Amino acid sequence: MFSPNISIVDGSLFFTISLIFVLVSFLGYFSFIFSGNKLISKLSFIALIIAFTIQTFAFTERWIYAYKIGIDTPPLVDLYDSLVFFAYVVILGFILLRIFYDFDALGFIITFVAAAALAFATFSPLATSAIEPTIPALQSYWLLYHIIALFMAYGAFGASFGLGILYLLKYKKESNSVKKQGRFLSLVPSSTIIDEAIYKVIVFGLVFLTVGIVIGAAWADSAWGGFWSWDPKETWSLITWLVYILFIHARITKGWGGKKMAWIAVIGFVVVIFCYLGVDILIPGLHSYATPGSTPVL
């Protein structure tokens, strides 16, 4: 019988506690988009900072526990750990973005994505918080750099997804398709500001995605004797990279912006999620870690 991943021994309890604070933040931002109350927004952000701090502690606790039981590589390769790390970098992306832009309304979307990832990690029978020894091929110094680079990219693309949604809503209003502005849209910066932020965030994410793929190729060569094997995960990573390269290319050479770029940001993140989770669940391959009975490999 499945039981939730809640244990103080391996640190998973603290991720569950962080989920509670993320949900509080989500409800706060949900209230904010209807009320426009800045105090509620500030309290929601504080709750998110608390969640992020708890997650930082949880990762530290979990990694220390892994070393204590004789596992020398950070526990990041299975579904549970990747989900909580995904939530972590998505929250980090929003925190950093909020420093430079007045995107409080984005908090509603970001906290929803983070809460969904944490809830999936905690309650899905596909995920387990038990820390297992990694296979020999994963016992490499490449592992940590590969994962961090990719998930920094995922966090940036998650932020661009939220910004893309905000842009499409704001654009619809500014183009007079919506006669009444409404409370929510009044809290969203101009479409020009959002468009600029989308571009910068995607460039940031693409740099890390490129680094992650290159590191992964070098790692594959040292572990399996080849840089590229057209594994389903590798193929979809390349597709994801091409989607965002298209974004940058069209922006620079064709002057694309606005609505087209916002749609690419939204669709691109759907591709990211499929590459990250869908491929591993639906298409068995070298990187499968979510399919029952498969080897946990990121």
Where do the protein language model's features map onto the residues?
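Polytopic transmembrane helical bundles with strong interfacial aromatic enrichment
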Residues: 1-298
